[in-house]
Amino acid sequence: MDPAERAQAARARVPRIDPYGFERPEDFDYAAYEEFFSTYLVILTKRAIKWSKLLKGSGGVRKSVTDLNRTFPDNVMFRKTADPCLQKTLYNVLLAYGLHNQDVGYCQGMNFIAGYLILITKNEEESFWLLDALVGRILPDYYSPAMLGLKTDQEVLAELVRMKLPAVAALMDGHGVLWTLLVSRWFICLFVDILPVETVLRIWDCLFNEGSKIIFRVALTLIKQHQEFILEASSVPDICDKFKQITKGDFVTECHTFMQKIFSEPGSLSMATITRLRESCRAALQAQS
């Protein structure tokens, strides 16, 4: 069958309307789409089988997943009285992930990440695979028992602030403030329950597309935008309070403007720089331990 015939045959098999209700354009490549989807369908099938096995296997596993009641207590869908109650879905996802990635198991903070994914996708299996992409690929060692990746990136942020916002770095040094005291929840929860929902969703779009660099962009933008306010602090409790306040207000609520700012405010931020800082910060942390 020549290319023209294959294209015509594919056009007859593939619906003109896509699954989201949109009509496909005249120049849509039906043959390429069919070829891609036939390959992708194999991947989806393998994933579905894997998910099914994990879910069945979780019955015999006893895991310390203790944060369910503290996951979005203000969200009616996570309350025990809800029907259906998303606590059960969250439990399934976390338990299955503990089986899938036993080096990580369950780590505090993952409940918020998984819970958000469940709210977004409304699907256990999709939430599981997105969680795997975050924990296993995009943010390796963030949620491992030693949390070395998380600790490293907090130190990287400190170095970036030292490079780009020296006055803020001097304030921290002058008061002996550890950055983990200020930003650990930003990194652990990926801004969930810290920034407004719509803003977090926009950040996560970039996180899945561009990788972990986006976390530094968000953090640097928050600090730079409020630099004068932060520099008014005169004590450690005052600094901590100001870092809580900078995650509130119109600046973070207006997500479109905020997302534009995170790509302009921090200035140049190459992966080469981040990789170099990660290597030096990780080595320093390992030397300390």
Curated annotation (Swiss-Prot):
Domain Rab-GAP TBC: 41-211
Record GO cellular component, one term: cytoplasm
Coiled-coil residues: none
InterPro entries (UniProt xref): Rab-GAP-TBC_dom, Rab-GAP_TBC_sf, Rab_GAP_TBC_domain
SUPFAM superfamilies noted in UniProt: Ypt/Rab-GAP domain of gyp1p
Single GO term (MF): GTPase activator activity
One Pfam family recorded for the sequence: RabGAP-TBC
Alphabetic keyword roster: GTPase activation
Role, per record: May act as a GTPase-activating protein for Rab family protein(s).
Protein name listed in UniProt: Growth hormone-regulated TBC protein 1
Name of the gene encoding the protein in the UniProt record: Grtp1
